[in-house]
């Protein structure tokens, strides 16, 4: 009973509570801030209360549902290890960021809007991962995207923030359309949105249709989890407050695509391996994204940019592992989720520490840093833990989770994927060393000497310290997590140290470390020449492999072509809309001229009548062209009058759904302007 109540309250509570943030803010801003923290705390408690029942042996998914839009379309919760793992992650990080925000966002304008969106996001993200059907999941999928857009554009007075928000919104919408297509095909094939029904009846769908569903779903995951080729939005999203970057763009929202593919693999079951090229495509997208993200992290001078590209790369690791699932082994599926949690801890830690550094220095450019080790020793120590974990060194969490990913890809047998993933681990170590050198080591820059930097407030350091502890502790949870996730895979702590992949892993770190040492510590002439702008490779990295350049050219030309087409169509419509009336008018005039030559008043009156009708028609058509909105309004009124015939029970559902959507949109508009 407790888990049933908790599974509903864990997402409904933050959603409803978000509506009270503006009300409380009218009385006390401090109460508003702590209200958000308290709700986040209660949400986290509710999330953790879901663990015991699964841990103590529930073999089948739990949950319940209720009628929503109609008796056939329900809203419900689906409690299994996958949904609970994500729910706990989102709720825990929501609490961490709510506490961190008390310090980081102190004194900012628009905090009512910030905390409203924060709670709305937490509720929406949990709703996404705990839904028991595709339609409900998609509604929350869209709400998460809307919150992301609003939070990225939080500093809306900055043009770059508005542009970044719009870019993220538009690029992720491509994935949303793809996912919606998959859901539509699934519903057309099964007649149900339910996960349970899909699991029981998925085999009835023809393989070509199922393949289309799988690839369309992958399209949604690619956009949401910043995979090639729709990855460029994540770097632009760094215009958001760093607390937002930590929650949405490191720990939770960007993992929605990973959740989606992991869920689809569970639904497909053995059929996943019969779909032509689907799993290999998932693996290749992940491997290439991981490699490309690591190379860009090694180039950018932006401290948040390094973390953004690192996130893209680590998401690639997770996607690659999901693609390495085989009929005989689910190790890749487990490794992906194990690393998903590891990444949340070390990348979330990185963003929290970057927020403290930016808070103290007022810049994101690492070239203006250096020498922070003395001024910010606690931040330095925590950053060292973050980098060692990111690099996958023992005994930190990513050593175990990343090792399992490498093992799963090795077992899958594609040698080129294995080579690229090893190369990516070397690049990860390299950009980690570069991060530490540019930020903390060496002499203070002139910029720092003028600022006299200091440690971040304790309210910002405590959440970071908790994540640092988890960076160490999480790796030892692997054997327990295997049982919790109900996966048949061998995970051994000692086995991680003595696996065949471990010596290779350590061997490739040596040249990576040597290159960074020669470049940034010894300033080797050869390496400095390699890094010069004259090197074509540096030009490629500077432009991010030219993805944005291509997109801007395509969309720019597309918009120009579309605009020109609309203009011509409009001119054609406006020129032709009165032609029927003018034709009638001309015909009537000729009739009148003819009748004057032949006979009396009756024909003349008929001609005059036709002329009057023609003039009225011409006037009406001109008004129609100029006042399309009035026509739309008229149609809407007619539609509303027809709703009288709709059964009252259905009408109540439609009105309730429409009213809820209207209230949410209205609140977002009001809060975006500022309260």
Predicted regions and their residues:
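Aromatic-capped, Gly/Pro-kinked transmembrane alpha-helices
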Residues: 481-500, 522-675
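N-terminal signal-anchor/start-transfer transmembrane helix
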Residues: 10-26, 222, 226, 290
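Transmembrane helix-loop-helix hairpins at membrane boundaries of multipass inner-membrane proteins
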Residues: 1-8, 19-116, 189-204, 232, ...
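Hydrophobic transmembrane alpha-helices and their helix-loop junctions in integral membrane proteins
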Residues: 96-137, 146-459, 476
């Amino acid at each position: 009973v407790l888990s049933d109540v908790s599974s509903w309250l864990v997402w409904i509570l933050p959603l409803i509570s978000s509506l009270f943030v503006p009300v409380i803010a009218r009385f006390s801003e401090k109460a508003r801030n702590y209200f958000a923290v308290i709700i986040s705390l209660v949400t986290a408690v509710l999330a953790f209360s879901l663990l015991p029942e699964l841990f103590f042996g529930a073999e089948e998914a739990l949950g319940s549902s209720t009628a929503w839009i109609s008796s056939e379309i329900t809203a419900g919760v689906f409690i299994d290890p996958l949904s609970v793992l994500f729910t706990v992650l989102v709720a825990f990080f929501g609490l961490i960021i709510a506490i961190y925000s008390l310090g980081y966002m102190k004194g900012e304008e628009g905090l009512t809007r910030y905390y409203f969106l924060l709670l709305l996001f937490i509720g929406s993200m949990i709703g996404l991962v705990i839904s028991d059907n595709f339609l409900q999941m998609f509604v929350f999928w869209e709400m998460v995207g809307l919150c992301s857009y609003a939070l990225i554009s939080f500093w809306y007075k900055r043009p770059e923030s508005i542009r970044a928000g719009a870019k993220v919104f538009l690029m992720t919408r491509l994935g949303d359309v793809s996912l919606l297509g998959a859901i539509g095909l699934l519903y057309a094939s099964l007649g149900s949105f339910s996960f349970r029904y899909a699991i029981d009846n998925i085999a009835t769908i023809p393989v070509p249709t199922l393949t289309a569903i799988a690839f369309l779903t992958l399209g949604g995951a690619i956009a949401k989890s910043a995979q090639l080729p729709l990855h460029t939005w994540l770097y632009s999203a760094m215009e958001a407050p760093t607390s937002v970057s930590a929650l949405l763009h490191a720990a939770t929202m960007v993992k929605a695509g990973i959740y989606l593919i992991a869920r689809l693999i569970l639904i497909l079951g053995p059929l996943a391996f019969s779909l032509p090229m689907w799993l290999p495509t998932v693996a290749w997208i992940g491997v290439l994204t991981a490699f490309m993200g690591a190379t860009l992290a090694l180039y950018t001078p932006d401290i948040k940019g390094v973390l953004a590209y690192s996130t893209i790369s680590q998401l690639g690791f997770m996607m690659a592992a999901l693609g390495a699932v085989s009929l005989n082994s689910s190790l890749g599926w487990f490794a992906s989720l194990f690393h998903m949690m590891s990444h949340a801890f070390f990348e979330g830690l990185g963003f929290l520490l970057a927020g403290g550094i930016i808070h103290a220095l007022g810049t994101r450019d690492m070239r203006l840093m250096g020498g922070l080790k003395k001024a910010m020793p606690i931040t330095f120590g925590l950053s060292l833990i973050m980098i060692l974990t990111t690099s996958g060194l023992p005994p930190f969490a990513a050593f175990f989770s990343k090792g399992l990913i490498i093992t799963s890809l090795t077992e899958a047998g594609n040698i080129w994927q294995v080579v690229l993933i090893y190369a990516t681990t070397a690049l990860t170590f390299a950009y980690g060393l570069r991060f530490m050198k540019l930020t903390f080591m060496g002499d203070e820059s002139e910029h720092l000497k003028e600022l006299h930097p200091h440690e971040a407030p304790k309210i910002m350091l405590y959440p970071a310290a908790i994540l640092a502890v988890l960076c160490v502790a999480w790796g030892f949870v692997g054997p327990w997590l295997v049982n919790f996730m109900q996966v048949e895979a061998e995970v051994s702590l000692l086995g991680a140290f003595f696996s065949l992949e471990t010596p290779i892993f350590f061997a490739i770190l040596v040249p990576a470390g040597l290159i960074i040492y020669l470049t940034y510590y010894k300033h080797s002439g050869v390496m400095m020449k390699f890094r010069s702008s004259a090197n074509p490779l540096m030009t490629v990295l500077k432009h991010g492999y030219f993805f944005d350049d291509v997109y801007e050219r395509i969309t720019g030309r597309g918009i120009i072509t579309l605009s020109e087409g609309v203009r011509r169509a409009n001119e054609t419509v406006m020129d032709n809309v009165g032609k029927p009336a003018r034709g009638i008018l001309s015909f009537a005039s000729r009739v009148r001229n003819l009748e004057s030559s032949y006979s009396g008043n009756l024909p003349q009156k008929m001609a005059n009548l036709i002329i009057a009708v023609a003039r009225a028609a011409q006037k009406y058509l001109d008004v129609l062209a100029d006042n399309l909105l009035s026509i739309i309004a008229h149609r809407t009124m007619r539609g509303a009058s027809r709703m009288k015939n709709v059964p009252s029970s259905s009408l109540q559902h439609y009105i309730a759904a429409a009213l809820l959507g209207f209230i949410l949109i209205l609140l977002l508009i009001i809060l975006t302007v500022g309260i």
